[in-house]
């Protein structure tokens, strides 16, 4: 019987940070918890960062994940938005590493590819697949579903069949191991 691994997935945002926690046992994935960390929109950036750090710390303390995964920042058309998103992501990373969690990072494209099967999937498709993959009775909020999708991506890439077929962690580029 294989051991259970608990994974925390984070979808960082300066206004709403989504999180999802799953347990992985062999090839099976089990829903544990998910939610959204909402920051006061009128608060100074430093206060919003503090909210993200504090709440992620509370989630880690309550659910005790063994691994974490965070979605990487994409470059937005608006540089100020990209910068704020990067700061929220930095807050999430700081909170996770302060709890000594190993952290992996995935692009939105990698998350959509792993969960939906295509990198250009819509948010609704991600939500639908999260519900299907975890056997949920309802649809989580979009940001929470994204957090769960990040956790599932980490599970599929590091604990699934792909990881067993490629134990050295090599990447495939143009059909060849690199």
UniProtKB/Swiss-Prot annotation:
Active-site residue list: 11, 71, 143
Places the protein is found: Cytoplasm
Enzyme type, top EC level: hydrolase
Cofactor requirement: Mg(2+)
Cofactor remark from the record: Binds 2 Mg(2+) ion per subunit.
InterPro entries, A to Z: RNaseH-like_sf, RNaseH_sf, X-over_junc_endoDNase_Mg_BS, X-over_junc_endoDNase_RuvC
BP terms from Gene Ontology: DNA recombination; DNA repair
Protein EC: 3.1.21.10
Pfam families assigned: RuvC
Residues engaged in binding Mg(2+) 1: 11, 143
GO cellular component: a single term: Holliday junction resolvase complex
Binding of Mg(2+) 2, residues: 71
Residue ranges crossing the lipid bilayer per the database entry: none
Catalytic reaction annotation: Endonucleolytic cleavage at a junction such as a reciprocal single-stranded crossover between two homologous DNA duplexes (Holliday junction)
Annotated function: The RuvA-RuvB-RuvC complex processes Holliday junction (HJ) DNA during genetic recombination and DNA repair. Endonuclease that resolves HJ intermediates. Cleaves cruciform DNA by making single-stranded nicks across the HJ at symmetrical positions within the homologous arms, yielding a 5'-phosphate and a 3'-hydroxyl group; requires a central core of homology in the junction. The consensus cleavage sequence is 5'-(A/T)TT(C/G)-3'. Cleavage occurs on the 3'-side of the TT dinucleotide at the point of strand exchange.
Record's subunit section: Homodimer which binds Holliday junction (HJ) DNA. The HJ becomes 2-fold symmetrical on binding to RuvC with unstacked arms; it has a different conformation from HJ DNA in complex with RuvA. In the full resolvosome a probable DNA-RuvA(4)-RuvB(12)-RuvC(2) complex forms which resolves the HJ.
Family indicated by similarity: Belongs to the RuvC family.
Protein name, per record: Crossover junction endodeoxyribonuclease RuvC
Species, as recorded: Neisseria meningitidis serogroup C / serotype 2a (strain ATCC 700532 / DSM 15464 / FAM18)
